[in-house]
Amino acid sequence: MKVIKVTGAIIQKENKFLICRRGPNEKAAGLWEFPGGKLEINETLEDCILRELKEELDIDAELHSLYDNYRFKSKDVIYDLYFFKIKEYSGNMLNTVHD
């Protein structure tokens, strides 16, 4: 069975957490998620989440730690999910993917 590694970012500021809703043209449109995405070939988990945050939110982030990981099995695919706490970020957060 195919295994896909996915990263997600836990961004907390003043007791609020950032979650994003998937855009209307995306798979699972309208569902809520932490920002992040799939690991590319020859990419580390840390590099993946930093790249995804730059692509999706136009921010440069500093990782705090790996918070948790979870394995989700669908009919045809296994997803290994890795959630990172974000220590700090810079840039004006722009939503480039979600609605």
Q: Residue locations for each model-derived region?
A:
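Conserved acetyl-CoA binding element of GNAT-fold acetyltransferases
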Residues: 32-37
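Unchanged
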Residues: 39-63, 71-99
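Conserved N-terminal beta-strand and adjoining loop/helix that marks the start
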Residues: 1-18, 38
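A conserved beta-turn-beta hairpin within the catalytic core of GNAT-like acetyltransferases
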Residues: 26-30
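Surface-exposed, flexible loop/turn segments at secondary-structure boundaries
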Residues: 17, 25, 72-74
